[in-house]
């Protein structure tokens, strides 16, 4: 039986308030994450850090972030989204503020690792929140809309961080954004009420056995989605890391031109991510895997044209199309567990998928760097590597089968795929 709080949470007012605050939480996470990237030159100068040391500081975040995906998803499934969202926000806000107290390279690395661990639980908890506050039919489009915050946050971050860094200095800047995160926690705590996933009550009433996080590892669908998103994330993180250098050294753009042109692919990605869940529901309902296959194949197609483009403007145009279609894969792989699996394991399922994405974020820049060095500065091998990654994502998506069995001999949403 639903309580008054649950009824409020399922109304338009309650569920869209929850969505809005989760969206803002994602934006805050990207602002806090970007603060180190923007302030790193100032920090490096104060501590006399070389590029290798600064790279270690940046990479450490992804290690902590990836480690926390599965535990974060499990905790969200067990304790509900509200507690884990607040706990994650608190930890990463505290360690954001603590960054302003750093006294050495070692301190920066430890704080950055703890920051990644703290923030790592948030994505899965936010996806669990969507499962709690929205019915199953609405979840795919809401996941797509929520994930567009990644690109909005990335666009907002320089506008927030740069003035703070300029007028306050890097230490006070970290204190300020850390305190802002704690203020947001208070708002979330008072406005959002805990809710239960509706299917959980139905499952209990029907006597259906619950699925454990461990049993997710036995579901072929999960591994197919992990591989699909890992492969696309190799493209995503690789281009994010190396495109500015490519445009400078190979296409001979100046920094001003790069600053004006490089936001365009992120705008395209934000649009596609926001649309992805809706497109899956309206145009690919019952054929979800074909959205992933088509989007991954088009990503490979436009990567080739990006590689062979004759002008820098055409490179950016094709990169925008690459980002547009690869973002449909992001929206799709995160939305499919919402449609195909019980809401009680949404946190663990999305955590498992995100391990693939974050692992690629750590690996891809290193692989590409070695390729560029091995081929004397040529990016030819890099682009063929990225094209092969898109093909791998398409192949993995194509292997998804209708009606795969879940533990307990029930089926994975047999009406989809």
Regions found by a protein language model. Name each.
Residues 67-105:
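Conserved MFS/SLC helix-loop-helix module at the cytosolic interface between two early adjacent transmembrane helices
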Residues 78-88, 281-296:
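Cytoplasmic membrane-interface "Motif A"-like loop-to-helix N-cap segments
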Residues 146-192:
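Helix-loop-helix hairpin linking two adjacent transmembrane segments in secondary transporters
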Residues 36-37, 220-274, 330, 334, ...:
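Extracytoplasmic gate region of multi-pass secondary transporters
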Residues 111-150:
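Cytoplasmic helix-loop-helix junction between adjacent transmembrane helices
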Residues 3-11, 196-226:
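Juxtamembrane intracellular "pre-TM" segments in multi-pass secondary transporters
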Residues 338-376:
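A late C-terminal transmembrane helix in Major Facilitator Superfamily
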């Amino acid at each position: 039986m639903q309580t008054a709080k649950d009824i409020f949470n399922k109304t338009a007012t309650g569920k869209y308030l929850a969505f809005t605050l989760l969206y803002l939480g994602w934006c805050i996470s990207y602002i806090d994450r970007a603060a180190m990237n923007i302030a790193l030159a100032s920090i490096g100068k104060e501590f006399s850090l070389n590029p290798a040391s600064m790279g270690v500081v940046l990479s450490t975040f992804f290690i902590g972030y990836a480690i926390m995906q599965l535990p974060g998803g499990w905790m969200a499934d067990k304790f509900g989204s509200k507690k884990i969202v607040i706990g994650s926000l608190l930890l990463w806000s505290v360690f954001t503020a603590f960054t302003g107290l750093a006294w050495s390279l070692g301190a920066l690395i430890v704080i950055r690792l703890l920051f990644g661990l703290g923030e790592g639980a948030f994505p899965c908890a936010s996806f669990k929140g969507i499962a709690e506050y929205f019915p199953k039919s609405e979840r795919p489009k809401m996941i797509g809309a929520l994930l567009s915050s990644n690109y909005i946050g990335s666009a907002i971050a320089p506008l927030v961080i740069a003035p703070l860094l300029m007028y306050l200095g890097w230490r006070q800047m970290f204190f300020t954004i850390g305190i802002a995160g704690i203020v947001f926690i208070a708002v979330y705590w008072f406005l959002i009420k805990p809710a239960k996933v509706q299917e959980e009550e139905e499952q209990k009433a029907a006597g259906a056995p619950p699925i454990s996080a461990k049993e997710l590892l036995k579901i072929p669908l999960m591994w197919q989605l992990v591989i699909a998103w890992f492969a696309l994330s190799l493209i995503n993180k690789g281009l994010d890391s190396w495109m500015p250098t490519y445009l400078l050294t190979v296409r001979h753009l100046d920094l001003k031109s790069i600053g004006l042109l490089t936001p365009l692919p992120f705008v395209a990605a934000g649009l596609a991510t926001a649309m992805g869940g809706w497109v899956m529901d309206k145009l690919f309902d019952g054929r979800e895997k074909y959205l992933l296959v088509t989007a991954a194949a088009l990503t490979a197609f436009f990567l080739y044209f990006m590689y062979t483009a004759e002008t820098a403007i055409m490179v950016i145009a094709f990169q925008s199309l690459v980002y547009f279609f690869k973002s449909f894969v992001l929206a799709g792989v995160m939305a499919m567990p919402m449609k195909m699996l019980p809401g009680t394991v949404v946190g663990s399922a999305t955590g498992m998928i995100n391990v693939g994405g974050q692992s690629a974020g750590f690996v891809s820049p290193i692989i590409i760097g070695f390729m560029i060095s091995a081929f004397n500065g040529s990016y030819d091998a890099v682009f063929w590597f990225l094209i092969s990654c898109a093909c791998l994502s398409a192949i993995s998506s194509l292997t998804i089968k209708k009606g795969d069995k879940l533990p307990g001999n029930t089926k994975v949403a047999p009406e989809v795929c």
